């Protein structure tokens, strides 16, 4: 139902909130279908009511002539309008680029497959080693161990990237809480895995299961604004401690 509503909003154009309301105390932005619900003044009203139509018209012409200069000028014009009235909440170019890379890499969706592969491989080799202790097994175990360390570093970078892009700690909703618990599971597996590789293998497998749950259809992985009720430094610490303790 949520995805159907999201698709419907996208088709209507309501999802593209590209026009900041001038001097709005809450820094609200509106989409083109919502423009008539807001009182824009003078030239601003004329601009927001016509710029998108002009842009789509130039796109059709540009497609035939293969010259997109007019379309690019209008895009720069829209960006200038956003900077003029919405600079307080407009993300930097670096943050925009970071989010694009983050979405393309899709690190957490890939990680659970790698965690599953190497966690299960480590567990299988450890079981085989009980019956036949060969030097070759020790080499494989060390290789898998350092590979898991590398995957954990990627996991940490993914969380840090999400923190940077969102502007708040990555455990503010169901999806973020689950991927954070998966990260904590691996770090404790690494700490206690020094005494037993079975601990590291088990923690990696559990983390894989947790991450796979995070990517089920009923969880939304999108990066969203923090809800006002959660906008508390101490609450973020409290949630982190409780989540990790599980």
Predicted features and spans:
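Alpha-helical transmembrane segments
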Residues: 236-246
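Core alpha-helical transmembrane segments of integral membrane proteins
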Residues: 93-217, 221-224, 231, 241-242
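Conserved hydrophobic/aromatic pocket- or pore-lining residues that grip, position, or stack substrates
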Residues: 78, 173, 238
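Alpha-helical protein-protein interaction elements
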Residues: 47, 73, 155-156, 226
């Amino acid at each position: 139902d949520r995805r159907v509503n999201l698709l419907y909003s996208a088709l209507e154009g309501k999802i593209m909130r590209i026009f900041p309301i001038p001097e709005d105390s809450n820094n609200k932005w509106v989409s083109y279908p919502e423009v008539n619900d807001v009182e824009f003044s003078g030239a601003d009203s004329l601009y927001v009511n016509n710029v998108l139509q002009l842009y789509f018209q130039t796109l059709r012409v540009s497609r035939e002539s293969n010259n997109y200069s007019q379309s690019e000028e209008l895009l720069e014009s829209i960006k200038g309008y956003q900077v003029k009235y919405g600079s307080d909440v407009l993300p930097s170019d670096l943050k925009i680029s970071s989010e694009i890379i983050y979405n393309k890499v899709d690190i957490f969706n890939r990680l659970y497959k790698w965690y599953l592969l190497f966690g299960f491989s480590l567990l299988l080799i450890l079981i085989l080693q009980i019956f036949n202790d060969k030097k070759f097994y020790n080499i494989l175990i060390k290789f898998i161990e350092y590979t898991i360390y590398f995957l954990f570093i990627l996991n940490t970078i993914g969380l840090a990237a999400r923190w940077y892009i969102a502007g708040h700690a990555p455990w503010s909703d169901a999806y973020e809480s689950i991927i954070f618990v998966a990260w904590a599971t691996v770090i404790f597996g690494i700490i206690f895995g020094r005494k037993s590789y079975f601990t590291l293998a088990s923690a990696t497998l559990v983390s894989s299961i947790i991450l796979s749950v995070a990517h089920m259809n009923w969880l939304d992985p999108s990066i969203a604004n923090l809800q006002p009720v959660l906008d508390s430094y101490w609450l973020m610490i409290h949630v982190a401690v409780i989540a990790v303790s599980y």
